[in-house]
From Swiss-Prot:
This is SAGA complex/transcription factor TFIID complex subunit Taf5. It comes from Schizosaccharomyces pombe (strain 972 / ATCC 24843). It is found in: Nucleus. Residues 8-40 form the LisH domain. The keyword Transcription regulation applies. Keywords: Nucleus, Phosphoprotein, Repeat, Transcription, Transcription regulation, WD repeat. The lineage of its organism: Eukaryota, Fungi, Dikarya, Ascomycota, Taphrinomycotina.
């Protein structure tokens, strides 16, 4: 009789659960587990039986946090990631239900759990106090309109489910609702992941737009090699370089390598990983382009060799005094003969840094007593400036929602480009000078050409202000950094995002792409620098040492050294290829530190911080923040500080 009995309900549940797990149906599996653990009581009945009182959120979060903290170390790192989105949406739910006092108490009790990784968002949420604030605030709507992405191993996910099912009547139902509405958990194969640095979030965690867009973006192929040179131009350049080699072949004082040989090294054909010549339309080459290429090869042959096995970078610092906090930006010209600065009073000042001071011809513009020239046209503070590669033109961007093109020779405004609907924070010329890009408060970046007054491409996808922008060396891509704490790489030809770099916990303040085109660096307002592999979209390492906003990044010509400057009054050099697997050590024991007396006695130097092992040197100023760092074509580092 017993042999003819069918399988028991427990066996059926186990068989179905195993099948669902193999097929990856995690949501269906979760619901079945809930049903199976209910002893005849349905999931809906259990969830409805829990009243979401103001005190229930505090109780629920407390039991979840206590359980996570008591978990095994192997699983604790992954489980901790669930706490922040639960904290955010519990707080927003309380505000939406008009329980301000309970929300305030909840915030004060648990905010310290998340200030290390999410300080920026935690501080923004503090200003909310009414249901209407939740509906209108940008940060709140980012979390309400986009699901928070988490990646758990199978074991970690099962542990979380088991805990929630056991505590359905003790607050687990509230967490289940929050996860279902606002969190997207992806199951990944393998063991639980453990981050080596607790102050860096997982690059796949958080909100970066729609999850399918991010996944597709990381899989799209990219062409990162240098764009091939025009064949006719290449022949002319080779002829000129060959003549130069012939002129100096008998000169005993000439120790530079053969220019033609260096040129061919720089332009080795690599059709597989390079965009085609017609991928990005460019105007015909001019005589000045040939001269510029010849000079670039000469500078390359005379460059300083930098790196841990060669020499540390030399830094030439220009300090601007008595700016009264009115200077917003500063930029060197590509030939290192001029500096352009933007000011709060809506003008630009142009300086010559050549010894003879002849690089600024007389013009009708306003000339100051210090020899600088004022450029007047904007109607709001100027936030960004950039020179064209041939040093003939200057671009600026302003709060007046426009970018303007200036002639360096005549010191006059030539064109106003109006396409943004908010202040323009940054502007960058492309490597060939024909195209430029702008970054704006309206959450977009735009691509322009100098001969059109309307944008050619609008790069939309960031969830907050686009704060910084730069071009890839082959001009086929534009890189942006945003206050949404992500960076994006955009295809200029198609106008789509092809890479999303997620991992910062603060707004991105500076970005740079290495001359080799395969590596990029991004920095944030907390002082962290992330190094990324553009091809795979994955983070290589995190560099720590700065203690505040980082304003500027620049790679050496060989892409082996990165320099950074920021509000902590230091210029720091980093070894790009050194790994950071070892534990961080005290900054006084890492690399070289050059510190003046005034910096040693300043208050912010008393703060205890750690520096990653790849820092090569830290150079301190006399309490003047660094606005710009830039390598010349000969690998001399130029920097600008402001008092």
């Amino acid at each position: 009789m017993s042999a003819t009995n069918g399988p028991q309900p427990q066996d059926l549940n186990r068989i179905v659960l195993d099948y669902l797990a193999k097929k990856g149906y995690s949501r269906t599996e979760a619901m079945l587990r809930l049903e199976a653990s209910g002893s005849g009581v349905s999931v809906e009945e259990k969830l409805k039986s829990i009243e979401e009182t103001p005190d229930a959120y505090t109780h629920t979060y407390t039991i979840l946090r206590d359980w996570v903290d008591s978990s095994l170390e192997l699983y604790k790192a992954e489980l901790h990631r669930i706490l922040f989105p639960i904290f955010v949406h519990s707080y927003l739910n309380l505000l939406s239900q008009d329980h301000y006092e309970a929300a305030k108490q909840f915030y004060e009790l648990f905010k310290d759990d998340h200030t290390d990784l999410h300080d920026f968002d935690v501080k923004n949420l503090k200003s909310l106090s009414l249901p209407s604030h939740v509906a209108e605030d940008r940060t709140a709507q980012q979390y309400r309109q986009n699901k928070y992405q988490l990646h758990f191993s199978r074991i970690t996910f099962d542990l979380l489910l088991h805990f929630l099912f056991e505590n359905v009547s003790n607050g687990g139902s509230i967490i289940i609702k929050l996860i279902n509405q606002h969190i997207d958990i992806h199951i990944v194969p393998g063991r639980p992941t453990v981050l080596e640095n607790a102050k860096v979030i997982n690059e796949q965690e958080g909100i970066t737009g729609q999850s399918f867009e991010r996944g597709d973006a990381q899989l799209q192929p990219v062409k990162l090699q240098q764009m091939p040179m025009d064949k006719e131009m290449e022949k002319i350049v080779e002829m000129d370089l060959e003549e130069e080699d012939m002129m100096h072949q008998n000169d005993p004082n000439n120790q530079s390598p053969k220019l033609l040989k260096e040129f061919r090294k720089l332009h080795e054909p690599n059709a597989e990983d390079a965009p085609s010549r017609d991928y990005i339309p460019l105007p015909p080459h001019k005589g000045v382009d040939i001269l510029s290429e010849v000079e670039a090869v000469k500078d390359w042959s005379k460059r300083l060799h930098l790196g841990p096995r060669a020499s540390l970078p030399s830094v030439c610092m220009y300090t601007f005094h008595h700016t009264n906090n009115n200077m917003n930006c500063a930029e060197f010209s590509p030939d290192s003969t001029m500096i352009a600065c933007g000011f709060q009073e809506s003008y630009i000042r142009l300086w010559s840094i050549k010894a003879d001071k002849k690089s600024l011809p007389k013009s009708t513009s306003v000339e100051d007593s210090d020899g600088s020239v004022r450029l007047l046209s904007h109607s709001g503070p100027v936030y960004g400036t950039t020179f064209s590669p041939d040093n003939k033109y200057l671009l600026s961007c302003s709060e007046d929602a426009s970018a303007r093109l200036w002639s360096v020779d005549t010191k006059t405004a030539l064109v106003a480009y109006k396409g943004h609907t908010g202040p323009v924070w940054d502007v960058a010329f492309g490597p060939f000078g024909h195209y430029f890009a702008t970054a704006s408060h309206d959450q977009t970046a735009q691509l322009w050409s100098c001969d059109h007054i309307y944008p050619l491409r609008v790069f939309a996808g960031h969830l907050s202000d686009v704060d910084c922008v730069t071009f890839h060396p082959n001009s086929a891509y534009v890189l942006t950094g945003s206050s949404d704490k992500t960076c994006r790489l955009w295809d200029v030809h198609r106008g789509h995002s092809v890479r999303v770099f997620n991992g910062h916990t603060q707004p991105v303040t500076a970005v740079a792409i290495a001359p080799d085109g395969h590596t990029m660096a991004s920095a944030d307002s907390e002082g962290l620098i992330h190094l990324w592999d553009i091809g795979t979209g994955r983070r290589i390492k995190t560099m720590r040492g700065h203690r505040g906003n980082i304003y500027s990044l620049s790679f050496s010509r060989e892409s082996t050294v990165l320099v950074s400057g920021g509000s902590d009054c230091t210029v720091r050099a980093w070894d790009v290829f050194k790994t950071n697997y070892n534990n961080p050590v005290s900054s006084s024991l890492t690399g070289s530190v050059v510190t003046p007396f005034s910096a040693k006695t300043s208050t912010f130097n008393e703060v205890n911080w750690s520096t990653s092992p790849d820092q090569m040197v830290a150079l301190y100023t006399k309490q003047t923040p660094i606005f710009n760092v830039s390598f010349t074509r000969r690998n001399l580092c130029l920097a600008i500080s402001v008092s």
